[in-house]
């Protein structure tokens, strides 16, 4: 005997003799639904068309999708399924497909790069009568060029297209290159974050029992696990919510002032509104961010990967007070030197840089404020 609790189209069985499990599930259901919708909004996806499953990483999500598609084809026909993969896919895709091929569960075709991207025509030419899935990432793992996911999906004519789109999201290009049928993401909500597998509901048909173990009404994410995932998401630091909060504070401040100035002015130079009366000539624009990594790691990565000129890293309560950032955000601060006029595009660029670095920096914790480093 079991009662069914729905969560965004996914179901879980709850034994009636475990009321504490039901309470935990109800506590986590609404907040987790909010995170699901937040992710779909980030992707530009219609919430009514997609299922979302939280995973440990994009690697797990990719493996779920590939193995389920192969097994579904084997259940439908005796013909060995065929999988199309790109030449620059992440190892979680290529190794999974090759392992299934060694077990004689599938065959596969690797699409070579043309001008550092996957040509939709080459994908069309590779289609066979037994093709069950194509795996083409939003960006190539080696050279980071964009693939035309919608064009590739059009030539597949109903064959599901699965895409790893983490780089597209963290580079701010997902709206220009939206996923087609299913997608995976890595390290959402901070460097201790979660992975995501998103699928259109029409692609989900018959895949549910294979991905969730016992079908949509059994073996899917259990109720205590829903609440645990919710607690995990809200405890991540830094989180998307936190970064967006700081971003909004800067937008509000920069509507009144062209620059956020480096500290070093005497108190006589600072009027009641916390900013200098006269703008010093030639003073470049700066943006301040609270980040979850040590200053030394960020300095090298930003300078080498993005060619952004770094000013200096400080920890100054006076500066935070001037621009009215709440005390709970007083952590290691990063000043990134930009152009003479700090525009919204500059802010957007820095947002993308820091969110991307969030996904590639090893796990760690913030140093105490007194240990913040500075450099010229």
UniProtKB/Swiss-Prot annotation:
The UniProt record describes its induction as: Expressed in the late phase of the viral replicative cycle.
Q: Does the keyword Transferase apply?
A: no
Q: Where is pyridoxal 5'-phosphate annotated to bind?
A: 58-59, 184-186
Provide the protein's localization.
Virion
Query: Sorted alphabetically, which InterPro entries does this protein's record hold?
Result: Aminotrans_V_dom, PyrdxlP-dep_Trfase, PyrdxlP-dep_Trfase_major, PyrdxlP-dep_Trfase_small
Recorded superkingdom: Viruses
Keywords associated with the record? Virion
Q: Which cofactor does it need?
A: pyridoxal 5'-phosphate
Cite the Pfam families for this sequence: Aminotran_5
Among its keywords, does the record have Chaperone? no
Q: Which family does it belong to?
A: Belongs to the class-V pyridoxal-phosphate-dependent aminotransferase family. NifS/IscS subfamily.
Q: What PANTHER family is this protein classified in?
A: CYSTEINE DESULFURASE, CYSTEINE DESULFURYLASE FAMILY MEMBER
Q: What is this protein called?
A: NifS-like protein
């Amino acid at each position: 005997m079991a009662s069914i609790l729905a969560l965004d189209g996914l179901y879980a069985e709850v034994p009636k003799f475990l009321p504490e499990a039901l309470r935990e599930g109800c506590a986590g259901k609404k907040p987790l639904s909010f995170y699901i919708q937040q992710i779909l909004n980030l992707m530009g996806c219609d919430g009514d068309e997609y299922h979302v499953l939280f995973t440990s990483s994009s690697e797990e999500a990719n493996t779920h999708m590939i193995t389920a598609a192969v097994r579904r084809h084997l259940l439908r026909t005796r013909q060995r399924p065929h999988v199309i993969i790109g030449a620059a896919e992440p190892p979680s895709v290529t190794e999974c497909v090759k392992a299934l091929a060694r077990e004689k569960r599938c065959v596969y075709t690797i699409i070579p790069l043309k001008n550092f991207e996957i040509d939709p025509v080459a994908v069309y030419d590779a289609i066979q009568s037994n093709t069950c899935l194509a795996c083409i990432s939003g960006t190539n793992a080696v050279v980071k060029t964009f693939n035309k996911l919608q064009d590739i999906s059009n030539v597949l004519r109903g064959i599901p297209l699965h895409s790893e789109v983490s780089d597209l999201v963290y580079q701010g290009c997902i709206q220009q290159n939206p996923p087609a049928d299913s997608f995976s993401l890595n390290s959402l909500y901070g460097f201790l974050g979660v992975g995501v597998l998103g699928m259109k509901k029409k692609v989900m048909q018959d895949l549910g029992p294979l991905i969730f173990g016992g079908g949509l009404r059994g073996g899917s994410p259990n109720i205590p696990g829903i609440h645990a995932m919710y607690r995990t998401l809200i405890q991540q630091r830094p989180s998307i919510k936190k970064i967006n909060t700081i971003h909004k504070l800067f937008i509000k401040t920069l509507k009144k002032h062209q620059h956020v100035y480096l500290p070093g002015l005497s108190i006589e130079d600072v009027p009641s509104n916390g900013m200098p009366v006269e703008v010093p000539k030639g003073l470049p624009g700066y943006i301040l961010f609270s980040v979850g990594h040590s200053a030394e790691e960020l300095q090298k990565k930003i300078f080498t990967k993005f060619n952004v000129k770094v000013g200096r890293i400080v920890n100054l309560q006076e500066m935070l007070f001037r621009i009215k950032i709440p005390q709970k955000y007083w952590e290691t601060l990063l000043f990134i030197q930009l152009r003479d006029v700090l525009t919204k595009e500059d802010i957007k660029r820095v947002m993308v840089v820091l969110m991307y670095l969030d996904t590639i920096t090893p796990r760690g914790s913030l140093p105490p404020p007194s240990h913040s480093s500075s450099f010229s």
